Amino acid sequence: VSLSKSKSNTNAHSSLVTDHAESEVSLSAVEKDANHMLIQASIQDSATSDEVDFVHDAVLLPETVAAVLGVKSLPTQAEGNDQNCLNMSGIYVDATFGRGGHSRLLLSQLADDAKLIVFDKDPTAISVAQELASKDSRVHVVHDSFATLTTSLAALGITQVDGLMADLGISSPQIDDGSRGFSFMRDGAVDMRMDTSRGQSVAEWLEYVDEETLANVLYEFGEERHSRRIARAIKQMESYDSTLALAEVIKVAHPNWQRGKHPATQSFQAMRIFINNELGDVDDFLAQSIPLLKVGGQLAVISFHSLEDRRIKQFLQRHSKGQYPEDENLPMPPKRPRYFSKPKRVGPSKTETSRNPRARSAWLRMATRTDSDYVIDDAP
C-alpha cells in the first residue's frame, strides 16, 4: 500500500570511483579536516551562543558549500585573512536552513550582490533565519516547505537560481528538544511536526488511524519488519501523550533488538516521515530543481537514510542518463533529455564521524545542470 501524501516522482575532489551513473568521491580525513576548525570558528563568530552547538555539528559543511558553488574546494581558511572568499555572485537556495551552518559558510563565499533564499518549516529555525536576515541584506527567508520552491521563489521575482542545497532529515536541536516529540530518549508530547504551527500531530493521527494503516506506515516509511505486531501494541495504548511511554510500548512489542539501536528507532522515523510528508516533499523538490537551475547550476543534497538517498540517487541517474525505467520494454524508447551531468557522491571522513556520530549515515550527492531544455512531459 502506497501511503505517500503527494505524488512521488520517481565539482568535487579527486579519487572518483564509478558506481552506475554516479562517481563516489573519497576524501582523506586530513584533506577534509585541514580547515575545519577555522571554518567552524568563522561561522560561530556570526552565530548567537544558543546556536553554536548546532553550527558545530553541521554535516559535510565545506563539501556541501563547495558543491553548491561548483568548485573543487573552498579557499584555505586563515585567521585574519580577508582573501579567503570566492566572492561569487548569483542566486542560491538553502532549502533546509536549520540553524544556518551551511548558509553562513555559503554567505562567507558570496559577493555583496548575491542573494541567498533560505527555507524551513520549523518556526524556531525561521526565527534564527530572520535574525540573520536582519544583519545581512543578501538573505531572504521563506517559512515553508522546500516543496513550494517554485511558487515561493516566483513570489520573490525569481525564476531561476545558480545553486540549490538541502540537508534532509531532522536536526540536532529538534532531536535534543524533548517537547518536539522526535526523541524516544527524552519525554515530551507525541508531536513530531516540523512545523508546529500547522497540520496534525502524530498523537492526533494515532487517535483515529486504524491498525492496518499504521502497520503499513511503519513498514513503508520505517522499513520495520515487525510493523504489524508493533501497530497492534500501539493501538492498544490508552493515550498518546508521552514519547517515552510510546517508545516503551514499541520496545516491549519488538521481538528482536539490534545491538546498539533502540527498538523504537524505525517506528519513530516512520511516523515522523509520514506526518511531515517528507518523502513527498523530497520528490517535489527534486522535480522542481530541473527547471529552476540555470545551465551550469549546482544541486547538492545531503541525506541520512536509505529511503531519501535511494530517491536522490534514482532521480540523478534517471536525469543524467536520460534513461527512464518505464521505457526499458518499449520497442522504440523515446530520446530523453539529460538534465544533469554525471552525479558524484561524498561521505563524511572518519574524523568527522568521530567528532559528530550523527554524520555516520550522511551522503552528499551532487550534480551540474546541463544545457538540455526543460520539457514538461519529461518531469519526474
PLM regions and their residue ranges:
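S-adenosyl-L-methionine-dependent methyltransferase catalytic core, i.e., the SAM/SAH-binding region
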Residues: 1-380
